[in-house]
Amino acid sequence: MEDRKRIVANHYEPLLNKYSRGYEILDWESLDCQVKRFEVLTKNVNLSGKKLLDIGCGTGDLFGYLNNLSINLNYYGIDILSKMIERAYEIYPKGRFFSGNIFKESPFSKKQFDVIFCSGVFNLNMGDNEIFFKEALPVFFSHAKEKVVFNLLDPGHFVQTDKYYFFNQKEVLHLIRQYSDDVITVTGYIPNDFTIIADVKKQQPS
């Protein structure tokens, strides 16, 4: 777990010093690509009146995006890097951001949120992404009452490099079936990405 944090810090913290715009700090291809990932969430999930947790919130850009849409919801963001959270508060002082490793020790209660959103957390190749993803699923679903939404890189539409990690859609769907009976896969918004939108089972695996 500490190796993952070190890898993430080594990759993203230099970008904090180099760039001022959130999508560049988070190593997205462009602002448009970042926004299109957010649009998948807002176009497919009714967020009005909901409590949402943004896992891997970075500099809080989803908070700013949702504010611009005037969606009435309770937003919370958490990131493993404290420097990201410091920057998030600089940009969005009215946001609710937390620094911590939710996969190791969560500061939140079970089923505290209606919707869990996680964008880009699994993109960087950490050497054990499959294990990390399997560990993350029960964390996602234990904190959500209604829906879990996350995106992953698609190996079929991208020149693969060792820097990033790509997931097989069929394998992801197989893993998630124990947590959800209603799963939607969204593709086509950008070539190298897919988003999973999963309803939360009332009875979760122990």
Outline where the language-model segments fall.
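A short SAM/SAH-binding and catalytic strip from SAM-dependent methyltransferases
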Residues: V115-D128
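N-terminal, positively charged/glycine-rich alpha-helical extensions of SAM-dependent methyltransferases
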Residues: M1-R21
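Class I S-adenosyl-L-methionine
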Residues: Q160-S206
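Class I SAM-dependent methyltransferase SAM/SAH-binding core
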Residues: L53, T59-E105
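Conserved beta-strand signature within the Rossmann-like core of class I S-adenosyl-L-methionine
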Residues: A144-L153
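Conserved alpha-helix/loop element of class I SAM-dependent methyltransferases that forms part
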Residues: L31-S48
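A short, conserved alpha-helix within the catalytic core of class I
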Residues: N125-L137
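A short acidic, Gly/Pro-enriched loop at the edge of an enzyme's catalytic core
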Residues: F108-V115
